[in-house]
């Protein structure tokens, strides 16, 4: 993102302020607004950002409320928006949060710990049909019906490690050998707990309204479900009825989109970046 020293920018996924720190360093008279649902992220990032500049505002809320929160601050347009989607490394690495399928922990997965709805509520209360539906909808889980059936048969389930064993035992050995099936199941549960796909769709609608001409939206995705939402959203924004092409008028697209993949060096340094895609979308000045 090309940062203007007097611009207004939004980091929708603050995390531990990795992106925000770099943006804030380049602002002189500009302003940075940061969102995160996680109170720990807000507290830890504040300590880092205040050492750089006072030109930032932290908002503990879901980025689905982007437009409403900016309106409270008297902001109705911005120069750039960044979103690094999914769960953050500190959340995955903390076993007490329940995001990791490789560590023992509670069935939690809440990004905002002030919310009451957790993964355990889904696992203990959703029927087999509902479980199958979310496993497919959120992560294309292979043989989702078998996983759902096993979860219902074995509940109540107390921990992440117990859930992992149930998932593995429910599926043919060949599938388990190919790839740890718990990864997709945990993704599906996490997305459902935090309504990540619904929030993403709502945020995109707000972001397109707020962005100035020549401004950019940068979105880092990590799986096909969220990436297809971003891609399809901007394709629809640029859609032109083929019948209009026959008219003697010049119809121009509003959005220009490109994709950047991680380099081999980046993949080696950060294994989690292997599945990442950076979509850069520019609002054209027409």
Curated annotation (Swiss-Prot):
Transmembrane segments: none annotated. It catalyses: cytidine(1402) in 16S rRNA + S-adenosyl-L-methionine = N(4)-methylcytidine(1402) in 16S rRNA + S-adenosyl-L-homocysteine + H(+). GO terms for molecular function: rRNA (cytosine-N4-)-methyltransferase activity. GO terms for cellular component: cytoplasm. The gene is rsmH. The keyword Nucleotidyltransferase does not apply. One of its GO terms (biological process) is rRNA base methylation. This is Ribosomal RNA small subunit methyltransferase H. Belongs to the methyltransferase superfamily. RsmH family. Specifically methylates the N4 position of cytidine in position 1402 (C1402) of 16S rRNA. It comes from Metamycoplasma arthritidis (strain 158L3-1) (Mycoplasma arthritidis). Keywords: Cytoplasm, Methyltransferase, rRNA processing, S-adenosyl-L-methionine, Transferase.
